[in-house]
Amino acid sequence: YIDAGGRLDRGGRTELAMQCSVYTRTGIERIARAAFEAATERGRLVHNVTKSNVLSYGATFWDEVVKEVAAEYPDVRLEKLYVDAANLSIVSQPERYDVVVAPNLFSDILTDAAAGVVGGLGLAPSANLNPDADVPGMFEPVHGTAPDIAGEGIANPLATVLSAALLFEDLGESDAADVLRSAVETQLG
């Protein structure tokens, strides 16, 4: 997210607010390549999720660049979805999905919905990876921390443990990742 936009006539009858989204070819190509690389090792399907039917500049540009990158991966299928339809089907047909590429706002929406399928945010790990690998990734539960429930003894730490498993996997320590996943499975019964 970026802080581009503004508000005019605060509190007035003609109050106006505008929030801009910024997409760069470099950024889109980078995340799209990471998605297609992941798909070559997995199910060979990438879902591209935007709202280009109404966001005719940024989202359309995103779709065009993802399609260009897809041409570099002829063995990987690309399926385009609008975020509203994807949000419904990620809950009703989660088995359809393996690799999803989407702008940050839509990804945030989809990860919340997908977390509900697996038992909630307390069970949803995430990895923010740098495809260039010149800086380390960040591994945390989907949407990070929950400061609103700090100290109440009700936070579920399992997403943190599963995020650590993703970290170990990224480091090439698959045995350690398996131990953590097994421990979570044991806890869940």
Question: What are these model-derived regions, one by one?
Answer:
Residues 6-11, 64-69, 118-127, 131:
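A glycine- and small-aliphatic-rich helix-loop capping segment at beta-alpha/alpha-beta transitions
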Residues 8-13, 40-44, 137-142, 158-160:
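Short amphipathic alpha-helical segments, especially helix-boundary/capping motifs
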Residues 2-7, 57-61, 90-93, 113-114:
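Short acidic, glycine/serine/threonine-rich loops at helix termini
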Residues 11-84:
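Glycine-rich phosphate/diphosphate-binding loop of Rossmann-like nucleotide-binding domains
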Residues 85-89:
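A generic local structural motif
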Residues 90-179, 183-188:
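Glycine-rich phosphate/nucleotide-binding loop
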